[in-house]
Regions:
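Residue register within tetratricopeptide repeats
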Residues: 28, 32, 63, 67, ...
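Internal alpha-helical scaffold/solenoid segments in large eukaryotic proteins
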Residues: 120, 206, 217, 225, ...
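C-terminal interaction modules of eukaryotic adaptor/scaffold proteins
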Residues: 272, 276-348
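Short coil/turn connectors between adjacent alpha-helices in alpha-solenoid helical repeat scaffolds
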Residues: 4-15, 19-30
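Alpha-helical repeat scaffolds
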Residues: 34-38, 69-76, 104-108, 139-146, ...
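Pentatricopeptide repeat
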Residues: 1, 12-19, 34, 49-54, ...
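Inter-helix linker motif
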Residues: 11, 45, 64, 79-81, ...
Length: 348
């Protein structure tokens, strides 16, 4: 009897057996043993579900037997083409999460050869996996394929590719990528603009940073906490106190609440200029008795690092069970610590 004709009846017992065989396949590394498992599944007279077939395919992928994968996919297409798209999706996801990019590419090629198109979810996942496990050059190729497919790169993909550039300190290339994605996209909020500002701030290109900030506002985008903190970190590291002060005023005008990063930028800038006594004036427009929070995008730290006050405060907060911390209290502790360290230095 033909295999396709045999898959007609299904009972809970048979289905359970098929699922058990599929799970067992994940533990096998021998092609011969896998063939035995696949043959048993065919004889069960049950059409395997997408997850079970995906397990078998992933097992074959781990030993590099793509001919067998192709045979399995074409057999499923003949019998139950409706589940084939789910099989592709699950298999691509499984290979991608394990960093088996070559296997993932082979599955996508097989998918296209069988007449299935790559949808938005699969295309974006493809880029994410390359961003996680591939080289920067491979990431750029993956994005190029997505772009040619006219699939819109979603926010998670934008962040992943941006992180790949940041890891390599390729800030100019990051800016080019973001412009290619499109600065006018509103479906991802301020993400693209904030990352563009970050690409200039990380290279301390202050004139370009200011110019693009003005363009962002003129384009109708309202600055958020990440926008202000990218600029504040750059101003702080460059000891541009007046620019930092103006940024805080703008922040207050926009009703954007500062976080630990914002306060840290001010503290570090004033401490570097030996102006600790002026901190009370610096915070006159802010409520430093408010509860501590850290809401800044972690990608910003990857590019700019964390300031001394921020890092020191995280240690204090991490070692404390008290949840009622204010910025003023953290600043007092930090100033005492710096005062003691300076005393020890001069005593030596």
């Amino acid at each position: 009897m033909d295999v396709c004709d045999a898959w007609k009846r299904e009972s809970p017992k048979q289905k359970s057996r098929v699922e058990g065989l599929a799970k067992d396949s994940g533990k096998l590394v021998s092609a011969e043993k896998l063939k035995v498992v696949w043959s048993e599944m065919l004889k069960s007279e049950v059409v395997p579900d997408a997850e079970s077939v995906s397990r078998i395919i992933n097992s074959y992928g781990s030993i590099g037997d793509f001919d067998m994968i192709s045979k399995i996919l074409r057999l499923i297409q003949l019998k139950d083409a409706e589940i084939l798209h789910d099989i592709f999706r699950l298999t691509i996801s499984c290979f991608g999460k394990r960093g088996q990019l070559e296997c993932m590419d082979c599955i996508i090629k097989e998918m296209v050869s069988l007449g299935y198109s790559v949808d938005s979810a699969t295309g974006n996942a493809y880029v994410l996996y390359y961003s996680s496990f591939g080289t920067l050059a491979e990431v750029e190729v993956a994005y190029g394929r997505l772009k040619r497919s006219r699939i819109l790169l979603e926010g998670e993909g934008i962040r992943a590719i941006s992180f790949a550039y940041i890891k390599e300190n390729k800030f100019y290339a990051l800016g080019k990528f973001l412009r290619n994605v499109g600065l006018c996209r509103r479906d991802v909020g301020n993400l693209i603009w904030n990352l563009l500002l970050l690409s200039y701030a990380a290279d301390f290109k202050m004139k370009s940073l200011q110019r693009e900030f003005v363009r962002m506002v003129e384009a109708g985008f309202r600055p958020d906490l990440n926008t202000f903190n990218v600029r504040a970190l750059a101003f702080s590291k460059m000891s541009l106190l007046w620019d930092l002060h103006l940024s805080l005023e703008h922040m207050t005008h926009e009703s954007v609440a500062p976080d630990l990063v914002t306060y840290g930028c001010v503290v570090d800038a004033y401490m570097d200029r030996r102006l600790a006594r002026n901190l009370k004036f610096a915070f006159s427009k802010l409520n430093w008795n408010s509860a501590v929070s850290v809401l800044t995008d972690p990608l910003i730290f990857e590019a700019m690092g964390k300031g001394d006050f921020h890092s020191s405060s995280e240690v204090v907060l991490g070692n404390s069970t008290n949840e009622d911390w204010t910025y003023k209290r953290l600043i007092d502790i930090y100033l005492k610590k710096r005062f003691r360290s300076n005393q020890i230095f001069w005593n030596y």
